Amino acid sequence: MTDFINTSASRSLENAVQDHFIAAEAPWSGIVRKGQTIRIEDSYGQQAIDTLFYRADDFGERYSNQDTMRAQGGAYIGTGTKIISNEGNVMLVMTADSCGRHDTSAGACSCESNTVRFGHGTKYLHACRDNFVLEVSKHGMSKRDIVPNINFFMNVPIKPNGEMTIVDGISAPGDYVELVAEMDVLCVISNCPQINNPCNGFDPTPIRVLIWDGEA
């Protein structure tokens, strides 16, 4: 684990209003209020972090990968990207990105996809979809509310013919993204447990999430 990196004079470990260490393979969820900044940190490097966002007062409005990609005209997100909802509203804006590669197309691993990709022996391995089902259930939602997600720090090159392949991640220990909330949002994370492809370097590790109030 690396030392804390400052991206703003007004943000430090001491003035974070929330600071969460999320175990390898575990889910997490929390509210990010309008104007707050959330940092999602890949503490040990090469760890995919599957993430969903919902409007906090109306879960029917949620992150839309197709609207986000359409609005920015590209498949990858980075500093300056506006995270768009299925209602066409800006949910968050990415204000910092020390890695530069995040996937919006490959979705979350599941028991079903593990079976298809890696064989029947992997069917019951822990998967992100299980994490999402568990975590959204705490907020009165079900698997019907799980939509295509962002995979922070996951490296999925897309060829001109549309072919995609999950390859080794490029994130280093301590790499992070920061997003400012443009509305109150529920953030739901699956710290990806996948061990059958290189999205986690075949070794899932803990991550960290910090939240700060808006700058004075």
Where are these regions (language model features)?
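Acidic, Ser/Thr/Pro
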Residues: 1-216
